[in-house]
Regions:
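N-terminal hydrophobic/helix-forming segments and targeting peptides
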Residues: 1-409
């Protein structure tokens, strides 16, 4: 990189600390209580009001019967324009009440958490309020437990040779006295009630880092909103952008699949977390791509991703000196980028990621520079598509004829 380019990058947004008001909004997004099946707290409670504060009156909003997914449409009704959907998912992996025992223990389902990472952490339980018909309430001050004490563990558990089984995990509500099960039921708890980690994000020790629960994937929803905020006043008029907050990703990409199946975008861009493989203990020996937190966002190649989109984004980033890292996808992207394939919709797809540490724990950590780089990269990609064909915009035929041929080398 020459001196001129180096000086330009030093002034780039992604090399600077995230503005406090932007960090505060990100914190608000990540704090939304939006467990799987209850995503409206984020999509309707946080994201929708934020969009309404800046989006032009001409934009439209798509809502859905079966989920709290929501789509903000830059050009409603303009089916002549090539449509580009950017999607983040609002659902958080959650625990659930499974059984209330006679001694007051509440046995819970740990979902996509590793049981040992949950023990001792504070959580919130959400349940119907028995005193207010149809209303929900939250219960705080609960912890997740397993053995009760190290004194009750087996020798193999103490050495680490034996782990903690998911069915050993329970919720500690500190009930005592007689009829402890009745005490728990009187709070309103019943099977299926969702439980979330109570761990808001905080600034990290190293510069421009932060940590906490549920970066997966409030970060994607935050990014979608920030991209829209950046482009709302520019009036891109040659592409139709569909800013999407989806649901049920963690249990099968069901929300995005339903939304894509209904709206049928021409291009699908998924934004989600990825792994910092370089820092993950023992992972380097598995020969994974050495993705690093703080070195730029990630772009997945493989699976059903469009090589044309990958190379176009890479070229845009190179031109604008935006840092990115290439990752590989095997048979499945593992994100909402699969939604079009799962829905049977003809869309060119790509996945954008943020390399984080400690995924699916209470201490997920990330770098604000990676987020800011991805936001600007996707915004630049949309501008590029808008300027395609001498300012006439990218067409569906462009996409249909974009497939890389290895026989023309």
């Amino acid at each position: 990189m020459n001196t001129t380019n180096e000086n330009a990058q030093k002034q780039s947004v992604w090399t600077q600390p995230m503005a406090q008001d932007q960090f505060d909004f990100m914190s608000t997004v990540l704090a939304a209580p939006s467990p799987i099946g209850f995503e409206a707290a984020m999509s309707y409670g946080v994201i929708k009001p934020e969009f309404e504060s800046f989006m032009p009156a001409s934009w439209g909003v798509h809502q859905f019967k079966g989920s709290a997914s929501i789509v903000f449409d830059s050009h409603p009704g303009r089916d002549d324009l090539t449509s580009i959907m950017i999607v983040g998912h609002a659902d958080k992996i959650r625990m659930q009440v499974r059984k209330i025992d006679e001694d007051g223990k509440v046995w819970i389902n740990t979902d996509s958490f590793l049981p040992t990472t949950l023990i001792g952490h504070e959580v919130k339980v959400f349940c119907l309020d028995p005193e207010k018909s149809g209303a929900y309430k939250s219960i705080t001050g609960c912890t997740v437990e397993a053995l009760g004490a190290i004194h009750f563990s087996t020798p193999a558990q103490r050495t680490g040779e034996q782990g903690i089984k998911p069915e050993s995990i329970y919720l500690e509500l500190h009930m005592h006295g007689e009829d402890r099960k009745a005490q728990v039921e009187a709070l309103g708890l019943r099977a299926g009630d969702p439980i979330l980690l109570d761990r808001p994000i905080k600034r990290g020790v190293a510069a421009d880092t932060f940590y906490g629960a549920y970066l997966d994937n409030g970060l994607g929803c935050f990014s979608v909103t920030e991209i829209a905020r950046m482009l709302a006043s520019e009036g891109l008029d040659k592409v139709r952008v569909l800013y999407t907050i989806a649901t049920h990703e963690e249990i099968g990409r069901f929300g995005s699949t339903q939304v894509v199946g209904e709206i049928k975008p021409d291009v699908l861009i998924a934004t989600d977390v990825n792994h910092d493989y370089e820092a993950a203990p023992g992972i380097g020996s598995r020969n994974m791509t050495p993705l690093k937190m703080g070195e730029g966002f990630t772009v997945g190649r493989g699976s059903v991703s469009s090589e044309f989109l990958v190379q176009t984004l890479a070229n845009v980033c190179s031109e604008k000196e935006i840092p990115y890292q290439i990752d590989f996808s095997g048979r499945d992207m593992g994100t909402d980028g699969m939604a079009a394939a799962l829905a049977g919709v003809d869309s060119a797809a790509i996945t954008i990621g943020y390399p984080i540490r400690n995924m699916h724990t209470s201490s997920e950590s990330a770098h604000t520079g990676d987020l800011l780089a991805s936001i600007h990269a996707i915004a630049e990609l949309l501008r590029h598509f808008n300027d395609f064909n001498n300012g006439n915009g990218i067409t569906r035929d462009d996409l249909k004829n974009s497939h890389i041929r290895l026989d023309n080398l």
